Amino acid sequence: MALINPQFPYAGPVPIPGPAPTETMPLLNYRVEGRIAGIQQARQFMPFLQGPHRAVAEQTYHAIGTGIQMGQTFNQPLINTQEG
């Protein structure tokens, strides 16, 4: 269950700056960029969280950040670097 601060209601998806996804930009990368934008927006509201809500938000923030780093590491195309 998401805790929503009535002072800052969620207004819907965050628009992502930059080019629209194409065949050369896999959908997974586009979703990762969207999550990064969402985390950057959520970071603005972190000071308003108190006590256990803040602790949970910080744990979630770090867990998502770790997941994004892993996703970027393991979502690389397989490239044969051997010549000849």
From Swiss-Prot:
Q: What is its main location?
A: virion
Q: Which UniProt keywords apply?
A: Capsid protein, Virion
What InterPro entries does this protein's entry cite? Tecti-min-caps
A single GO cellular-component term from the record reads: viral capsid
Q: Which GO terms describe its biological process?
A: viral capsid assembly
Domain of life, per UniProt, equals Viruses
Q: Where, per UniProt, does this protein localize?
A: Virion
- What function is annotated for this protein? Minor capsid protein essential for stable capsid assembly of complete particles.
| Subunit and interaction comment | Dimer.
Name this polypeptide is given: Minor capsid protein P30
Q: Which organism is it from?
A: Enterobacteria phage PRD1 (Bacteriophage PRD1)
